[in-house]
């Protein structure tokens, strides 16, 4: 009697990351379905598409490769148990049973025939037509071979494949034999503790203009640091004692929220944090911690950035947060803030609920990225040194809040105020010219940029305006390209309106941000001009995702 199984379901982006963590490597090919999950909701068996399209590179024609294994056993608990059975000779026992027991042999042959038919049913019409015309030998492999690609249906290639086939809900005598043996030994088909469940964490950051929270599921990324991008954020990993064996994880957002708290408002004049800004920030942190608990996060890390760094009374804020929220507020350095933003762009993978076998990412090659994180009081530039592999960053005192306070006194701003502000931005950005253009750093060539990624509230809001969103949708915003002409037009439209009118602009997902958006857009425009870039890419990931990655590695944060 085969046991009950769940219906086939579409894979989510997070499922592929979980499967890679389960296997200890990335799964080749695409996941078509997940026929079985454990009671903790994690994949136990995945179904893979039978054709892999291989890019030959250097302009060569893209060619298909056969991928005959339909069902993969991914659950490490079951895989380990089946490995024990293999080591004890069960493949030989199954082969002997096939040879001497006619009913078992017929059932085994039927299983292989059915498996081949299921494989063919997965192939799309266009791929099938191509294989019939251009690759008939490959088509025969997919059509005529059995479980795991065996040519002889009387053979048993791998016990794990038969168990995967059986656990997917199919009649498979070898898989049934293995599972029955496990049951007799008291081994069940899932673990007790949910070992594959991603860590759910909360990252809260008190910025100069807003306080934000990200509740995220964090999935380990095995051996990632050992690959071609092995040195990405190595300083962060070393700072927290990582040997490089685990790798930078993937961060999948569960819930994201932000509140305009104005911590840095008026700081330039007084050198102190306003009482209203401190109170609003503490209240937001307290509320966000409650939200995080309700969503099941078990660890939290709370940080503050430029405003808290610059204020002479930041210790008062730290005390208030400790007393009201019973958590330590960590004021991070500008260098560490930049590294966390870089890590966030690399680790951020969109929403945990997103459907698809491949997680979205703007970080195709981290070595070619320039990350520009523009906040309320500062703008950080971060990239990799292509020679040393170290993360390099600089921070400039350019922020949407501080620029608005200093230059944009009228409502709407006058053209003279706008020109004076843009001139100041250009002057300050000269300090980043060599860094942005990848000129020698420490006597070595810095490398060539191919992608500028902008993160932060201004960038996300500009993307939301371009998409005319009613509410924040990180998966829509993530990867959105801001073109120079589009951004100039948006900038003109924003500063031409009074603040009250600006708040009504479609896509202004946080009306409270309307006051500082002309300055935020101007910073990004001037960065594009400095770099000679026709477009920049918006990332919904940033410092919060980087913080979540560090929490997921167990390097920081506290029990929630």
Where are the regions a protein language model picked out?
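An exposed acidic His-Trp-rich patch
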Residues: 78, 82-136
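Aromatic- and glycine-enriched beta-alpha-beta binding-site module
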Residues: 37-101
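Short N-terminal edge-element motif at the start of the domain
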Residues: 2-60
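Intrinsically disordered, low-complexity terminal tails and inter-domain linkers enriched
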Residues: 219-250, 351-364, 441-445
């Amino acid at each position: 009697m085969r046991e009950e199984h769940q219906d086939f379901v579409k894979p989510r982006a997070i499922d592929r990351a979980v499967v890679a963590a389960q296997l200890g490597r990335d799964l080749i090919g695409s996941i078509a379905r997940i026929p079985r999950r454990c009671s903790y909701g994690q994949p136990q068996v995945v179904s893979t598409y039978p054709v892999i399209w291989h890019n030959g590179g250097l302009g060569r024609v893209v060619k298909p490769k056969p991928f005959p294994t339909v069902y993969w056993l991914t659950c490490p608990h079951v895989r380990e148990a089946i490995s024990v059975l293999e080591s004890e000779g069960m493949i030989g026992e199954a082969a002997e049973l096939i040879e001497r027991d006619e009913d078992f042999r017929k059932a085994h042959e039927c299983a292989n025939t059915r498996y081949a038919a299921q494989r063919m049913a997965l192939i799309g019409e266009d791929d099938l037509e191509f294989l019939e015309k251009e690759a008939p030998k490959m088509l025969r492999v997919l059509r005529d071979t059995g479980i795991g690609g065996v040519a002889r249906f009387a053979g048993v290639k791998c016990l794990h494949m038969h168990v995967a086939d059986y656990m997917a809900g199919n009649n498979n005598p070898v898989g049934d034999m293995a599972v029955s043996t496990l049951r007799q030994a008291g081994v069940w088909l899932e673990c007790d503790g949910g070992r594959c469940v991603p860590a759910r964490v909360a990252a809260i950051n008190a910025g100069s203009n807003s306080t934000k929270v990200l509740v995220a599921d964090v999935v380990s990324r095995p051996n990632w640091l050992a690959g071609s991008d092995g040195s990405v954020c190595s300083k962060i990993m070393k700072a927290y004692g990582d040997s490089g064996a685990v790798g930078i994880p993937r961060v999948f957002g569960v819930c994201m929220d932000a509140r305009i708290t104005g911590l840095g408002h008026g700081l330039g004049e007084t050198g102190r944090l306003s009482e209203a800004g401190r109170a609003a920030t503490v209240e937001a942190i307290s509320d966000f911690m409650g939200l995080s608990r309700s969503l099941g996060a078990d660890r939290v890390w709370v940080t503050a950035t430029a405003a808290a760094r610059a204020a002479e009374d930041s210790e008062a804020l730290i005390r208030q947060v400790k007393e009201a929220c019973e958590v330590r507020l960590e004021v991070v350095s500008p260098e560490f803030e930049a590294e966390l933003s870089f890590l966030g762009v690399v680790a951020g993978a969109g929403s945990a609920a997103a459907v698809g076998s491949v997680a979205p990412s703007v970080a195709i090659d981290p070595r070619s990225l320039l990350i520009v994180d523009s906040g309320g009081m500062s703008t950080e530039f971060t990239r990799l040194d292509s020679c040393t592999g170290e993360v390099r960053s600089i921070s400039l005192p350019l922020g949407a809040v501080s620029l608005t306070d200093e230059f944009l006194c009228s409502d709407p701003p006058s053209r003279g105020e706008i020109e004076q502000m843009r001139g100041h931005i250009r002057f300050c950005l000269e300090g980043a010219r060599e860094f942005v253009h990848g000129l020698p750093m420490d006597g070595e060539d810095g490398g060539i940029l191919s992608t500028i990624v902008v993160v932060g509230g201004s960038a996300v809001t500009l993307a939301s305006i371009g998409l005319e969103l009613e509410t924040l949708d990180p998966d829509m915003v993530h990867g959105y390209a801001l073109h120079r002409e589009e951004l100039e037009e948006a900038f003109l439209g924003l500063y031409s309106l009074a603040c009250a009118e600006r708040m009504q602009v479609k896509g202004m997902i946080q009306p409270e941000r309307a006051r500082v958006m002309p300055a935020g857009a101007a910073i990004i425009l001037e960065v594009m001009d400095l770099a000679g870039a026709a477009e920049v890419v918006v990332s919904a990931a940033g410092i919060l995702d980087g913080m979540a990655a560090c929490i997921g590695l167990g390097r920081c944060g506290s029990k929630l």
